[in-house]
Amino acid sequence: MAITKEEIIDAVGSMSVMDLNDLVKAFEEKFGVSAAAMAVAGPAGAAGGAAAEEQTEFTVNLLEAGANKVSVIKAVREITGLGLKEAKDLVDGAPKPIKEAVDKKTAEEAKKKLEEAGAKAELK
């Protein structure tokens, strides 16, 4: 019996972020492809207009865990929904992105929680 697309989607949907990262790396190695987004060149005269647009998607980066690593791990778990081991691995591997492609309010709240826990964080 073959696995259906729905079964694959359900399996991927139940994976943790760290497991998904490993899956993407395995696909890249097996099929010789890259999951990196391709850069698209905009129209030649759009450079001035692009600077005037407000950024709508932000990435929260954990730069440094600081002295109170336990509190930072708790904050990362709260922000991302990761398990204890995944959150600890993420904090130990800093600097790393914690949340990607989120709105400004969510990004600022996540940064505030990380800084209150004693970490150094930035928005990009």
UniProtKB/Swiss-Prot annotation:
Highest taxon above the source species: Bacteria
Gene3D superfamilies: 3.30.1390.10, Single helix bin
BP GO terms, sorted: translation
Stored Pfam families: Ribosomal_L12, Ribosomal_L12_N
This protein's GO CC annotations: cytosolic large ribosomal subunit
Region (Disordered): 102-124
HAMAP family from the UniProt entry: Ribosomal_bL12
Family recorded in the similarity comment: Belongs to the bacterial ribosomal protein bL12 family.
Subunit structure: Homodimer. Part of the ribosomal stalk of the 50S ribosomal subunit. Forms a multimeric L10(L12)X complex, where L10 forms an elongated spine to which 2 to 4 L12 dimers bind in a sequential fashion. Binds GTP-bound translation factors.
Protein name: Large ribosomal subunit protein bL12
